[in-house]
Amino acid sequence: MKDPILKEAELRMKKSVEAIDEELKKLRTGRPSPALLEEIKIDYYGVPTPINQVATINVTEERSLIIKPWEKNLLSAIEKAIQASDLGLNPTNDGNVVRLVFPSPTTEQRQKWVKKTKEIVEHGKIAVRNIRRDVIKELKEMTKNGEISEDDEKRLEKEVQNLTDKYIEELDKLFERKEKEIMEF
């Protein structure tokens, strides 16, 4: 049976990695993705509402997103919200749908996105290492109080380090995958 401290540490590390993965999905890469619009909200009858809750968002083959609102009166609100966002895209409204065309990113833009990806992943690594630090501190406290032996402390510290290495490696893989996605497009 796994020690409860290790289970807790693993759960926290896993959640940190999942949070970073979600954040990376929202990062612009030059490739159209409905996830890019998740944070953009429009005023829907006085309530700030994400675009994906008032419209269908589809990716087309020609590097664009098609946003088809369920109510046509939302077209201009969607268009304005996208223009006001930090995506740097110019939506076009044809009266039925809002179209977002993704231009080919420049090398400079790609490098900027890779740098941003690296920063996000580094925050995840820091979070994982902080969890390790907290657990090791807790283990030392337990040894000091006589709750566990020094041998158990060393064994658990080694297992915590193995968990840390595992999740740092996962974060590195996330970075490599995102970097490849950014640079290949």
UniProtKB/Swiss-Prot annotation:
InterPro entries: Ribosome_recyc_fac (IPR002661), Ribosome_recyc_fac_dom (IPR023584), RRF_sf (IPR036191). One of its GO terms (biological process) is translational termination. GO terms for molecular function: ribosomal large subunit binding. The keyword Ribosomal protein does not apply. The keyword ATP-binding does not apply. Coiled coil: none annotated. It is found in: Cytoplasm. SUPFAM superfamilies: Ribosome recycling factor, RRF. Belongs to the RRF family. Responsible for the release of ribosomes from messenger RNA at the termination of protein biosynthesis. May increase the efficiency of translation by recycling ribosomes from one round of translation to another. This is Ribosome-recycling factor. It comes from Thermosipho africanus (strain TCF52B).
